[in-house]
């Protein structure tokens, strides 16, 4: 009996997180089908899990970045520049794919009058201005509001200043960073329960019947995201590491993408991505900066959403689009996507900005945004899964390109699963 109990407890504490998440996923679906009321009640588990991740993520980013820069040794190599290039290349490539697929399989929308009091950004300059304003935010305000651009700016500044501090001070900062990491690991162990609650409550609240009317649009959107995740990203990774990219890609989708799909928050998934980078033995000086930065500017999924929904509105209204305009839309969508994390409503609220390129009135553009919110159950989940998993994929690719010793047929084989 004791052996049975210890075996069960061992599975809970040290077992594969992915397998446990799968159990939670199936249990959530079953509960939603059996009892709507019970499914809505367990939604609290999902709310608590996402809340815990969002609470710990800003502190984790601040401490990790500050500790890694403060303890950085002169001449030690990092891969931030190549990763930034991969982020921008991936986002622009995603926008191009979305344009191509939207022309091959044009979508149309049934636009109904929809009043909305949400203010969309007025232009690209406004989006970029908001991004720059995030850099100079008050540090306490940045932590409280999960402003990762501001947190990164302060962490880098304090880290550089602390490089001249006493060794005991650096050791204290490092110990604090390790302590926060332990808290993060504990929170992540509750992922199966959190996802059980999220799946059960989401299915009970919305079901999937409401999505059937937008089946074609969803197929185009999710098809683009799958194409980027399974074809474009592997091609970029292969170009970078010159090896079979799929073991790395599938490992990242499995470990990072699955969790991000259900939490629907790149910020909440930062601790998961950090832990995965640690399991792959990547350079902490690199991933402690690139992962939170990726959660802010690496937005391939957002670029796809902006492009597909904008072109759906264009096709619905019968507006002709030539090739140069389509290419310009790709650039605009990529730039907008990089600022999506700083806009309330994310990628959907940047659609009116892209629609403005084609002279579409704001009233109609906001109706397109309303359609986006209707399909958000799947659209936002798939978008976040692509965005967040790509952060780890490109970080790992850049690190492996710089250090061939990190290459492994199974990227996570060197250590046990979380």
From Swiss-Prot:
Localization, UniProt? Cell inner membrane
User: What UniProt keywords apply to this chain's record, in alphabetical order?
Assistant: Amino-acid transport, Cell inner membrane, Cell membrane, Membrane, Symport, Transmembrane, Transmembrane helix, Transport
InterPro entries annotated for this entry?
Na-dicarboxylate_symporter, Na:dicarbo_symporter_sf, Ser_Thr_transp_SstT
Q: Which GO terms describe its cellular component?
A: plasma membrane
Task: Output the GO biological process annotations, alphabetical, semicolon-separated.
Answer: serine transport; threonine transport
Q: What GO MF terms are annotated? A: neutral L-amino acid:sodium symporter activity
* Catalysed reaction equations from the record: L-serine(in) + Na(+)(in) = L-serine(out) + Na(+)(out); L-threonine(in) + Na(+)(in) = L-threonine(out) + Na(+)(out)
- Classify the protein's membrane topology as the record does: Multi-pass membrane protein
Principal localisation: membrane
Membrane-crossing residue ranges in chain numbering: 21-41, 45-65, 83-103, 142-162, 193-213, 217-237, 301-321, 331-351
**Known Pfam families for this protein?**
SDF
Concerning its family, UniProt says: Belongs to the dicarboxylate/amino acid:cation symporter (DAACS) (TC 2.A.23) family.
Q: What task does this protein carry out?
A: Involved in the import of serine and threonine into the cell, with the concomitant import of sodium (symport system).
Query: What HAMAP family does the record tag this protein with?
Result: Ser_Thr_transp_SstT
UniProt name for this protein: Serine/threonine transporter SstT
**Species name:** Yersinia enterocolitica serotype O:8 / biotype 1B (strain NCTC 13174 / 8081)
């Amino acid at each position: 009996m004791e052996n049975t109990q210890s075996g069960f407890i061992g599975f809970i504490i040290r077992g594969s997180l992915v397998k446990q998440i799968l159990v939670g996923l199936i249990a959530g679906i079953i509960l939603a089908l059996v009892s709507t009321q019970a499914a809505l009640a367990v939604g609290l588990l999902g709310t608590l899990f996402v809340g815990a991740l969002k609470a710990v993520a800003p502190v984790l980013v601040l401490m990790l970045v500050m500790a890694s820069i403060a303890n950085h040794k002169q001449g030690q190599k990092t891969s931030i520049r190549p990763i930034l290039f991969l982020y921008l290349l991936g986002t622009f490539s995603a926008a191009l794919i979305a344009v191509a697929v939207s022309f091959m399989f044009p979508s149309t929308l049934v636009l109904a009058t929809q009043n909305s009091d949400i203010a969309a950004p007025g232009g690209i300059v406004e989006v970029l201005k908001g991004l720059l304003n995030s850099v100079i935010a008050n540090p306490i305000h940045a932590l409280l509001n999960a402003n990762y651009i501001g947190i990164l700016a302060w962490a880098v500044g304090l880290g550089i200043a602390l490089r001249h501090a006493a060794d005991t001070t650096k050791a204290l900062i490092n110990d604090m960073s390790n302590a926060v990491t332990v808290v993060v690991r504990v929170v992540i162990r509750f992922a199966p329960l959190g996802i059980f609650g999220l799946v059960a409550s989401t299915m009970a609240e919305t079901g999937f019947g409401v999505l059937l009317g937008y089946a074609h649009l969803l197929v185009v959107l999710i098809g683009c995201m799958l194409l980027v995740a399974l074809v474009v990203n592997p091609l970029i990774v292969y170009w970078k590491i010159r090896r079979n990219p799929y073991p790395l890609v599938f490992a990242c989708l499995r470990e990072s993408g699955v969790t991000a799909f259900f939490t629907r928050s790149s910020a909440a998934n930062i601790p998961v991505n950090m832990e995965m980078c640690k399991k792959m033995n990547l350079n902490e000086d690199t991933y402690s900066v690139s992962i939170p930065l990726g959660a802010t500017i690496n937005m391939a999924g957002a670029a796809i959403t902006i492009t597909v929904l904008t072109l759906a509105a264009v096709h619905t209204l019968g507006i002709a689009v030539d090739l140069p305009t389509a290419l310009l839309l790709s650039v605009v969508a990529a730039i907008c996507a990089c600022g999506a994390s700083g806009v309330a409503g994310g990628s959907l609220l940047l659609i009116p900005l892209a629609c403005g390129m084609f002279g579409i009135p704001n009233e109609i553009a906001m109706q397109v945004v309303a359609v986006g919110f209707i399909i958000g159950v799947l659209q936002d989940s798939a978008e976040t899964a692509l965005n967040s998993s790509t952060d780890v994929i490109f970080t790992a690719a850049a690190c492996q390109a710089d250090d061939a010793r990190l290459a492994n047929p199974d990227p996570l084989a060197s250590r046990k699963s979380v």
